[in-house]
Amino acid sequence: MDFKIQWFPGHMTKAKRMMEQQLKLVDVVVEMLDARIPRSSSNPMLIQMLGDKPKVVALNKIDMADPEKTEKWLQTFKNSGLPVCKVDCSTGKGVKQMVAAIQQVARPVTDKWLRKGVRNRSIRVMIVGVPNVGKSTLINRLVGKNKVVAADRPGVTRGQQWVTIAKGLELLDTPGVLWPKFEDPEVGFCLAVTGAIKEDVYDRETAVELLLERLMHIYPEDLRVKYAIDFSEAEPVREVMSKIAVARGCLKVGGVLDIDKVIQLVLRDFRTGRLGRFTLDEPSENN
């Protein structure tokens, strides 16, 4: 796969330094992963920063991921000894279970407080993850009000902010942070098509071609049904794009393929879940 991205805006460098400082103040870290790409959305730079800090893994956007593969990923994390839960921050599904997991992993800390006579102290939690994974939406769900800016595009949450909620949790929202170079082009591809990377730093046409090729082999029936087209799995991806263009009216004058409209259509349908429930990262024993 020839898909290279290098994206590390200046505010991310600053955010990384801030998180390293804030880590000293928190009791638990929640690493939020995109359930469609659990491996690719796990930031190796963050893993190195966190060290042995108590951590909970939250698989978000489960409503857009392949349910069967999500269960396999949950088992993979459990087998590695990591507390993990699946959540849908947009609806609140699984959020209570995540809070319970946070309280459980923080138990040694809170027990230590009690032995020292410290009471009524909130568990301080840092939420980390790549851009657009749903961190601010989670905090808004926990708080019950839109106290944190959230939007469906990468790079929205620029400052770090603490939010205290009534359940004895004090949360720190952090800007999404990527790492400066993706050694595995598969990781860059997955982050790009799910919307974690701004579209002006990679070739969208290549991304959509690779995405359609992947879906043609893994989820062919979803493609056929969604766009009312027929194709063989060995068919060239450009021909499939042309069929989508005809089916959805993405044509210029004279019946010429409007590639920009097809790209926009496929990315939108994939990112919003309209195309189907897909998981691009395959769970395996070696993850």
Predicted regions and their residues:
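Glycine-rich phosphate-binding P-loop
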Residues: 124-144, 148, 174
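Short, well-ordered alpha-helical segments in soluble proteins
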Residues: 102, 106-110, 131, 142-146, ...
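Helix-rich effector regions associated with P-loop NTPase G domains
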Residues: 1-28, 36-37, 42-45, 49-55, ...
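Canonical P-loop GTPase G-domain recognition
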Residues: 56, 62-129, 147, 248-251
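Short, glycine/charged-enriched secondary-structure capping and boundary segments
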Residues: 44-47, 71-74, 99-101, 140-142, ...
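Alpha-helical scaffold segments in soluble metabolic enzymes
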Residues: 97, 101, 137, 210, ...
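Conserved active-site beta-strand-loop modules that form the wall/rim of enzyme catalytic pockets
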Residues: 89, 139, 169-172
